[in-house]
Amino acid sequence: MLLVDVATASVDVGAMSSRLAKTARIADLLSRAGTEQDARLVAVTVAWLSGELPQRQIGVGWAALRSLPAPAAAPTLTVTAVDAVFSEIGAVAGKGSQARRAGLIAELFAAATDVEQTFLRRLLTGELRQGALIGVMADAVAKAADVPAARVRRAAMLAGDLPAVAAAVLAGGDAALARFTLQVGRPVGPMLAQTATGVADALDRLGGTAVFEAKLDGARVQIHRRGSDVSVYTRSLDDVTARLPEVVEAALALPVTDLIADAEAIALRPDGRPHRFQVTASRFGRAAARATQPLSVFMFDLLHVDGADLLDQPTSDRVRVLDDLVPAAHRVDRLVTDDGAAAQRFLEATLAAGHEGVMAKSPNAPYEAGRRGAGWLKVKPVHTLDLVVLAVEWGSGRRTGKLSNIHLGARDPATGGFVMLGKTFKGMTDAMLDWQTARFLELADPAAQPATSGRDPTDGHTVKVRPEQVVEIAFDGVQGSTRYPGGMALRFARVLRYRDDKSPAEADTVDTVRAFYEHG
């Protein structure tokens, strides 16, 4: 199969709004890949259309892609050949490795057509956002293999590897799915939560009674133990065992032989209050930091204990087993109630302790690994800021031809200018995209556009605009960042509305943002 086949499918899917249409388009491509009877080809195709590399990280980012050769006139690259190049790039190490990687990238892109270059660039930089994510992809795999979608989703959940499931089912049909079972030592995708507006909303949606748990702003980890062997994985299924000895020790102290647990690792201050998330995150890069910044581990769910799979057991049963095995020092605070006032007090106490909010779980919900299940709801306060738009990026896929990703700035009273805090393309409706495209083209500052574009705001990736438009932004927190001049960045920023009633002089200041950073 040629790379252009995958690149074209990516463009097609990105332009589609219908889930059924996306599913059908991807299924057609996978059916063609399946006829070549090459398991790796199928797995790579699924991974790429999901925006992932089978090799994970290969050391190529935006800097390596700034100066690329002219595109080839005709498509010749195969998926298999490109996959091999990625593996070769990822294996480069030692003296001269940067130059060697650059040479391989240049050679690859010189053989790629324009549409292929665009696809490869977006794939390598993590910006392949065409909507073909796990749900759609699982349905497409099922359609291509002519098996029930629920069976594919279940296998992908247990394997933690949809590309591998796709390769197996397209080669062996429904019978091939039987081999994908929950296994200690093989991580699965964590269950994710939907959002509730408050504890009352959560109780209503969960049937009147809920299991409320403190939501810690740490790092989600999945713990696997078989005898004296313990493995620890991140939510993206990366193995971080060697970096988190405290988690290993906590798992080994439990009175079990086999275990799979869902947990949170977090850096706490001496008074028990949490450090900023970045302090916790820093430990995932350096095991040696334990001496200066230890981590605490809090388990909140069990997927497997001593030969028994608990995925399909209700929350209430899994919690009961958890309480029997895990000491209180390693469990999150919990309240089971149908009383809205009691739930609100629990939320307020959790926030006062410095944590993010609470999780509300249905007592009857199974553990839906890898899915954002309706049985889990997160409740946390939403912070908002009025910021100023400094620039906008042209969109891709369904947003091609629309100004999409906005650059956000806070007012700096000391200089009279604005300090950039990040970007977001989240929360925008189609109507908002239409409006902001027209609005920001009006505000485009020709003098600020690159000379290479002829000062034309429509020619280039980013449009610099006059800082006149105020936008209300919701965000979950503020973290330190070396990427932006203020040393801070918003976490999970999304657009609520544009504030035409406010002038830039009324926007929030960088000092207000710094207060969020310092005090939460």
From Swiss-Prot:
An MF annotation (GO) of this entry: DNA ligase (ATP) activity
Cell division in keyword set: yes
TM helices/strands, residue ranges: none
Keyword DNA damage: yes
Cofactor: Mg(2+)
Catalytic activity: ATP + (deoxyribonucleotide)n-3'-hydroxyl + 5'-phospho-(deoxyribonucleotide)m = (deoxyribonucleotide)n+m + AMP + diphosphate
InterPro entries noted in UniProt: ATP-dep_DNA_ligase (IPR050191), DNA_ligae_ATP-dep_bac/arc (IPR022865), DNA_ligase_ATP-dep (IPR000977), DNA_ligase_ATP-dep_C (IPR012309), DNA_ligase_ATP-dep_cent (IPR012310), DNA_ligase_ATP-dep_CS (IPR016059), DNA_ligase_ATP-dep_N (IPR012308), DNA_ligase_N_sf (IPR036599)
Residues that bind ATP: E213, R220, R235, E264, F300, R372, K378
Active site: K215 (n6-amp-lysine intermediate)
GO terms classed as biological process: cell division; DNA biosynthetic process; DNA recombination; DNA repair; DNA replication
EC nos: 6.5.1.1
Primary role: DNA ligase that seals nicks in double-stranded DNA during DNA replication, DNA recombination and DNA repair.
Protein name (record): Probable DNA ligase
Gene this chain is encoded by: lig
